[in-house]
């Protein structure tokens, strides 16, 4: 079986960090200013977020950008 794509691993990392904060996907999407459907696509690897969007994710999670890429 092929390894998960970078987008899927990144999305899983975002979901993992979001869940650690206790936020729902909808609350997290609102905090980021994204539609919930876009957030769902990020978390499932269906979207390829821009660098600006990745910075928004990090800020909403209150983590350094590098944390988003740890262990992916």
Which residues does each predicted region cover?
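Conserved hydrophobic/aromatic packing and binding residues within compact polymer-binding modules
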Residues: 14, 28-29, 39-42, 68
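DNA major-groove recognition helix of helix-turn-helix/homeodomain DNA-binding modules
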Residues: 52-67
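A detector for short, charged/polar N-terminal pre-domain segments
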Residues: 1-9
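Recognition helix of helix-turn-helix/homeodomain-like DNA-binding domains
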Residues: 33-48
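Short basic helix-loop element that most often maps to the first helix and adjoining turn
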Residues: 12-31, 56
């Amino acid at each position: 079986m092929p390894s998960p794509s970078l987008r899927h691993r990144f999305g899983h990392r975002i979901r993992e960090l979001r869940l650690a904060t206790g936020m729902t996907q909808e609350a997290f999407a609102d905090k980021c200013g994204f539609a919930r459907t876009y957030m769902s696509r990020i978390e499932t690897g269906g979207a390829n977020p821009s660098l600006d969007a990745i910075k928004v994710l990090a800020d909403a999670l209150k983590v350094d950008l590098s944390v988003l890429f740890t262990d992916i």
